[in-house]
């Protein structure tokens, strides 16, 4: 998407009273400018539309989520697998807009249902409180009462 054109069009439409849900790439500056002109929903891509590549830059997408906690974020484009949809939810995004993944699936109805089920499972797992990510190994088993321990 054209950043300048999208920002300019969004600003004009917002002034006319429209609610604008702009499609963007994963550039945080682009997102920030859209928010500055008044957009309440931003729809960054996971990867270029129709490619099915998934989330090619998870760090950028996470930074967008972390930077704009009060903005509704809907990932739009690039989803190709059910696991991609789960990643989006795990990043804290509010939703997913997908078309190509369903429309081009061999069994679209089955794929759509699978995405729905996976997203519900990802949401449920987040509510269950997954463990924190650590850069070092942390055993979860006690050594108390184990043979050969000093």
Predicted regions and their residues:
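Alpha/beta enzyme core
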Residues: 1-150
